[in-house]
Amino acid sequence: MWNNVRQLNLAASALYALLLLVLAAAGCYWLIQRPAFALREIRIDGDTEHINAPTVRAGVVGRLKGNFFTVDLDLARVAFEQMPWVRHASVRRVWPNALAVTLEEYKPLGTWGNDQLVSVDGELFTANQGELDAELPSFDGPEGSAKEVVARYRDFAKWFAPIHATPEEVTLSPRYAWTVKLSNGMQVELGRERNSDTLPDRIQRLVAAWPSVTQRWGGDIEYADLRYPNGFAIRAAGMRFLTDTDKGKK
């Protein structure tokens, strides 16, 4: 090889190219570590009705590792999405030392259980309920049932509309039986949903009879049990049931 000029030239060229690569890599590493590229600004925009940008920024900045070039954008996105009210975050670099973050927040539909909220998309999330702008419906159900409960809430709102009542509480029991508390104060036991017609048929029976029910007992119906196959039972304020002793006095 040492007597072969062509091979020596090739080897020298290869070593020279390798040296240039090493120097270029070292130069790049030196450059990207300069203080000028340390992250100095996090710009937050997007849907932030319930999101306080300074609070989010303060909660995330200590979890960001690296500078403009080395920060992991996926890890940064996850950090933002772990903040209260944040449903989705997109993060991008802004030359030379900033991140631009666009946030999408959860749209609350109501409360879920004791300490969670549920979104209009049926997603559970945790946030300060004191930040809610209005009294929202209450929901509860078995694990994994949030989307089903939210869908049924919308159905109940439509089915009970003819009696001018809206759902304020919707509960799905561990046995998958439905209970609804309406805005007129009435609690409705609907039972289990055996097929797609079970719930609308039961509610329709009550709706059809509602004029007669309110004419007889007034509008203050406290409870309705719709689980019967061909009818329903109600309890109205002031309704009194006779005991055997009462019957004997008549």
From Swiss-Prot:
Coiled coil: none annotated. The chain crosses the membrane at residues 12-32. PROSITE patterns: POTRA. Residues 1-11 are cytoplasmic. Keywords: Cell cycle, Cell division, Cell inner membrane, Cell membrane, Membrane, Transmembrane, Transmembrane helix. Part of a complex composed of FtsB, FtsL and FtsQ. Essential cell division protein. May link together the upstream cell division proteins, which are predominantly cytoplasmic, with the downstream cell division proteins, which are predominantly periplasmic. May control correct divisome assembly. This is Cell division protein FtsQ.
